[in-house]
Amino acid sequence: GISTSGATPGPLAAALKAEIPGIVNSGRLSWPMEELVVLGDNAIRGSGMYADPSILSMYSLRFIYGNAVSALNEAQSVVISESMAKKLFGDNNPLGQTLKMDAKAAYSVDGAYTVTGVFRDLPANCNYRFQWLSPYETWEKANPWLQPWNNNLTETIVELSPKASPATINKKLTNYLSTKISGATNQCFLFSMNDWHLRGKFTDGVPDGGNIKYVRIFFTIAVIILLIACI
C-alpha cells in the first residue's frame, strides 16, 4: 500500500520557495517535543517545536512581548506561550531572561536559551498547541543528519500567493522529488491546513475522511431530532 505522511526532507522548504512560482513563503518545523523548562528552582514541562522564523508570521501568532519578525533570528532564542510565561515569570516581562532547556526528548537540544517573545496561548482546537518555539537551525546544527534530501523528518509549511492555484502547483510537485533524489518514487503535494483536522486521513495516498465523519454523524443526528420534532 501507499503511506502518506507530513514528514518531508529538510531542504524542501527553501527549494520550493525558490523554484515553484506561486509559493511566496516557506518554513520548517520539527516534530513536537516535550522539554523540562527551568528557571532557577522553578521547572515545568512544556511541549514545543523547532521552527524557522517564517513560521511565526505564517501561523499569525499574536505576540504580547517581542516581535514576530525577529524573535527567532538568534540561535539560542526561544519564544514561549503566555501561560508558560505566567508560570515562570508571573506578571513580569520575560524578554531577555535566560531559560534552561533540559532535553527530555530524542534529538532535542538542551542548553541556555534567551526569551525573545511571548505569544498568546493557541486555541484548544489547534492541531499544534506548542508552548515554546526555538530556531530550526539550532536543531539542524545539532542533528546534521536532517540536511540530506533523503531524510524525511521535517514538516514543510508553505504560503501561496492569493492568485496561486493549488491544483497547478500540485501538478508541478508530482515528480519534484525525483529531480532532487536519484531514483526517488516518493511524491509530495500541498494539503491545506484548513483540512488537517477534519480531512487528515489518507488510504493508499487518497484522502479518506478524518474527523469530518463525526461532524456528519452529528449532523445526521441533528436532522433526525429536528425531523422528529416536526412530526
What would you call each of these model-derived segments?
Residues 6, 49, 78, 216-219:
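Residues that recognize and position ribonucleotide moieties
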Residues 6-65, 187, 191:
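Short amphipathic beta-strand/extended segments in non-transmembrane regions
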Residues 14, 34-35, 97, 156, ...:
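Residue-level detector of beta-strand structural context in well-folded domains
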Residues 37-40, 75-80:
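Short secondary-structure transition/capping segments
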Residues 52-65, 77-210:
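Mid-to-C-terminal secondary-structure elements
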Residues 69-73:
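Glycine-rich loop motifs involved in handling phospho/adenylate chemistry
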Residues 210-231:
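Hydrophobic alpha-helical transmembrane segments of multi-pass inner-membrane transport and secretion
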